[in-house]
């Protein structure tokens, strides 16, 4: 479970304008409350990943407040990117760099050892106080690489299985997902391919992205890496709103839970919650639910998740495209001890696929039905099949 709770106190930007890294947002509870929640989650086998916002802080952050008060005399002036010959949009008497032009978010100087020392001490306290299991690094594409290397080494010593997952949009994920920096990052390439393939009825797009990333050819770029995969999140329009055809919701999740990566579900989307990203805010994406609203989609997702958890091939297997059509896709996930075909049909029409690798006796895991293939596989309309051989 990934949570963004720490450091905001009465923030104005969805808890990304940190004021105090060592205090839980008071609107949600106390540090003791969160410690109790973490303990309860751990008792149920759930690990906790906190949102680590280390690129910037809010204007209310104590060190920035000290700079506002003392200007040149502040010992924290080198914690930020400042110019005392200019002025800010807030008439502070000095200019400072804000994250991507957002001046309510003051960019930290992560190349300053004092800043990185402070942040690492905060992470240490989170681990000691809450026993968290990992961090999702906000805007990891903007973070100093030396800082991420130091963070990886530091966390490894404190808690060997501690996970570091970065928010990265596009570009080469290998730059920060490697043995020295992060364990994983967000796979926005496949996020985009997932919904646009279905909206355009062109499954060649997602098939190309998956092969480009995880295929067996020497030029495939992320083989062996476990990227964080998703159909929606707190920054993008929800799946149920962006898909043109509601019948494709199950198809999208069938691909997501069958493809390589670490699948992540956004709260509420497990029952098909809708939400459109607005040009100037994300409020519609982050509603408060008084209670869960489970339905048939929820039950179906729970079933797919259970199947994935029990399958070495779905979790760790190689990837290979078998059949690619505009409306249909069949790909293989394979380890030394298990072979699974993931077959989807996004069309309202039944389709029969023919291929030499569609052979053998196996089990369709979703329905628990035995079947024998002799070079052909019939796909019902709007269907997902996981066939184990």
Q: Where are the regions that the model predicts?
A:
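Carbohydrate-interacting/catalytic domains
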Residues: 40, 180, 204, 249, ...
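Hydrophobic faces of well-ordered beta-strands that scaffold small-molecule active sites
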Residues: 48-50, 135, 164-166, 229, ...
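Aromatic- and acidic-residue-enriched segments that line the glycan-binding/catalytic groove
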Residues: 13-19, 54-93, 179-189, 280-284
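Single conserved hydrophobic/aromatic residue that forms the stacking wall/gate
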Residues: 1-7, 12
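Active-site-proximal helices and loops of the catalytic beta/alpha 8
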Residues: 128, 138-221, 255, 274-303, ...
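The substrate-binding groove and active-site-proximal loops of carbohydrate-active enzymes
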Residues: 15-30, 101-116, 133-142, 197, ...
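Core domains of carbohydrate- and sulfate-ester-processing enzymes
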Residues: 44, 62-105, 193-216
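Aromatic- and glycine-enriched glycan-recognition loops and surfaces
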Residues: 8, 16-47, 245-247, 295
């Amino acid at each position: 479970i990934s949570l963004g709770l720490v450091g905001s106190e009465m923030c104005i930007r969805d808890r990304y304008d940190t004021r105090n890294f060592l205090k839980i947002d008071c609107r949600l509870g106390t540090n003791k409350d969160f410690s109790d929640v973490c303990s309860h989650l751990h008792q149920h086998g759930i690990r906790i990943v906190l949102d680590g916002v280390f690129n910037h802080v809010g204007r209310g952050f104590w060190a920035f407040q000290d700079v506002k008060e003392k200007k040149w005399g502040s010992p924290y002036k080198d914690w930020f990117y400042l110019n005392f010959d200019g002025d800010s949009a807030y008439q502070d008497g000095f200019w400072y760099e804000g994250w991507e032009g957002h001046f309510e978010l003051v960019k930290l100087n992560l190349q300053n050892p004092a800043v990185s020392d402070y942040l690492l001490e905060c992470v240490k306290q989170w681990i000691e106080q809450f026993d968290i299991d990992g961090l999702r690094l906000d805007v990891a594409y903007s973070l100093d690489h030396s800082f991420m290397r130091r963070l990886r080494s530091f966390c490894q010593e404190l808690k060997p299985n501690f996970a570091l997952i970065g928010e990265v949009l596009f570009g080469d994920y290998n730059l920060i997902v490697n043995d020295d920096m992060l364990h994983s990052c967000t796979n926005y390439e496949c996020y985009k391919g997932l919904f646009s393939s279905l909206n355009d009825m062109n499954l060649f797009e997602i098939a190309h992205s998956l092969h480009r990333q995880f295929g067996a050819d020497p030029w495939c770029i992320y083989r062996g890496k476990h990227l964080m995969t998703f159909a929606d999140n707190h920054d993008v329009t929800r799946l149920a709103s962006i898909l043109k055809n509601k019948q494709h919701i199950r198809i999208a999740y069938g691909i997501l839970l069958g493809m390589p990566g670490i699948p992540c579900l956004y709260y509420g989307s497990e029952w098909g919650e809708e939400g459109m990203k607005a040009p100037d805010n994300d409020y519609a994406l982050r509603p408060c639910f008084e209670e869960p609203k489970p339905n048939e989609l929820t039950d179906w997702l729970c079933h797919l998740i259970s199947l994935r958890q029990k399958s070495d091939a779905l979790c760790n297997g190689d990837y290979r495209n078998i059949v690619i059509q505009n409306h249909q896709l069949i790909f293989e996930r394979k380890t030394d001890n298990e072979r699974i075909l993931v077959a989807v049909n996004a069309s309202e029409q039944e389709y029969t696929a023919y291929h030499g690798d569609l052979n053998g006796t196996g089990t369709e895991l979703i329905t628990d039905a035995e079947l024998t293939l002799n070079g052909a596989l019939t796909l019902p309309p709007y269907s997902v099949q996981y066939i184990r051989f």
